[in-house]
Amino acid sequence: MYKLKTRKAAAKRYKAVGNKKISRRKAFRSHLLQKKSTNRKRQLSQVVIASPGDTKKIYLMLPYL
């Protein structure tokens, strides 16, 4: 049996949290920030739990998570 490869791009973006859940960061927080409100930027900087539909696909990309 050969080793399964990890998708490195996915490994950098997602982290495992307890009980088979995946944490991720929100998008749209890297540039063009001057037109976005402070409240919006604060909400975008939060870490959230990935949706259950995406979690299945993420676990396929990260076999050793």
UniProtKB/Swiss-Prot annotation:
Database matches in InterPro entries: Ribosomal_bL35, Ribosomal_bL35-like, Ribosomal_bL35_CS, Ribosomal_bL35_sf
Main location group: plastid
Localization in the cell: Plastid, Cyanelle
Protein origin, superkingdom: Eukaryota
Pfam families (UniProt xref): Ribosomal_L35p
Example GO BP: translation
GO cellular-component term (any): cyanelle
Keyword line: Cyanelle, Plastid, Ribonucleoprotein, Ribosomal protein
Alphabetized GO MF terms: structural constituent of ribosome
NCBIfam families: rpmI_bact (TIGR00001)
Record-stated family: Belongs to the bacterial ribosomal protein bL35 family.
The protein's name: Large ribosomal subunit protein bL35c
Organism annotation: Cyanophora paradoxa
The gene coding this protein: rpl35
